[in-house]
Amino acid sequence: MQKKIYIKTFGCQMNEYDSDKMADVLNASDGLIKTDKAEDADVILLNTCSVREKAQEKVFSDLGRLRELKLLKPDLMIGVGGCVASQEGDAIIKRAPYVDLVFGPQTLHRLPEMLKQRRSTGRSQVDISFPEIEKFDHMPPAKVEGATAFVSIMEGCSKYCSYCVVPYTRGEEVSRRFDDVLTEVAGLEAQGVKEITLLGQNVNAYRGEMADGEIADFALLIEYIAEMEGIERIRYVTSHPKEFTQRLIDTYAKVPKLVDHLYLPAQHGSDRILAAMKRGYTSLEYKSILRRLRAVRPNISISSDFIVGFPGETDEDFEAMMKLIDDIGYDNSFSFIFSPRPGTPAANLADDTPHEVKLKRLQRLQAVIDQNTRRYSDEMVGSVQRILVEGPSKKDADELQGRTENNRVVNFSAGPNAAHLIGQMVNVNITQSHAYTLRGEIVVKQ
């Protein structure tokens, strides 16, 4: 019987990409196939996130449940990867001695050897080193199902924002070679992928070495990918305002395949708090980027991250953040109460704001963003949107589902025998808007 692997992914799209690579590596080396049921698996991997404390504690909660499964299946291999693994290392084994593997984001390509060592020695294996970009040299060619795919173009972050653990868990910024990225995208194009999302903690800091030794920036990478005929849409996450160059803005004017949606985390709107966060820009500089971008893409949708209750945040600071939100008119946003992460400078800052105050601020911020989201969705009713059909609707198998350029899910009926439309671009007339989705009808060519 073919052995199976179950992977649970926490956190960001980088982790989703890494989880796919874990499955690819272990399929190529050991023939493991993916399963959606942990109880059916021979290997279980938790790909973790340490950005917020809640996500970290979920991991140890899951490990507690897996302990019971291991008692029933002694040969079961349990591994912890990702940023919690990188941060905690051997401490995971001490807290949960039944864990067999602990590996960081940069060492997932070593999983086959780690499994082999665990089985031969009987000892838990830990490898949380930072061998720069080595892991991409050991990956089998990407295999995908569907019309969309992620491609990691760089690893790590060198910004060292005062609240963030990423530089400590994923290392400094290292870019993949230019031709390696293009080769991966071309391979995905050959499999029918129409939409590529370029991934990195700070994608617009990309500096990839070309075959002639020259260095390509992020804008050039986008331009080359856009030349691939089969790729119809290009997205990217996450970008940093400090690295958002005029060249990248000019690329929006030149490359129609670059979607009308930008995720550009502001984190706050108070210059005093932005300085304490070590973000490297002011609210005015942030707004200047979007003003120049909207000059070439007037209809671009903007989303962001916001941290509420950063240590020392006053009512005045919070109002500055609300003003930024009002000035920009965000389409949507991820927002959270500040979560101090061990080892970061912000974890040592005095914080005397009551939790109840932070919670009220968060609720107010989210209410405004939700109102914006609903307003933008309502304004789309009656328009015809170009949709990339991703598959059957999750709520009605007789309908299809796809996304607009501004990343809204659209459910629509396309009549009988419409499965051939999956993976295609179609025009859909938007007829209804809901909180987070749209409904529509396919536009039939006359």
Swiss-Prot record:
Example of a GO cellular component annotation carried by this entry: cytosol
Localization per record: Cytoplasm
Binding site for [4Fe-4S] cluster 2: C157, C161, C164
EC number(s) from the headed UniProt entry: 2.8.4.3
Coiled-coil residues: none
Leading EC class: transferase
Domain of life: Bacteria
Domain Radical SAM core: 143-375
Residue stretches making up the TRAM domain: 378-444
Annotated [4Fe-4S] cluster 1 binding sites: C12, C49, C83
Major location category of this protein: cytoplasm
Annotated GO MF terms: 4 iron, 4 sulfur cluster binding; metal ion binding; N6-isopentenyladenosine methylthiotransferase activity
Bound cofactor: record note: Binds 2 [4Fe-4S] clusters. One cluster is coordinated with 3 cysteines and an exchangeable S-adenosyl-L-methionine.
Family membership: Belongs to the methylthiotransferase family. MiaB subfamily.
Protein name: tRNA-2-methylthio-N(6)-dimethylallyladenosine synthase
Primary gene name: miaB
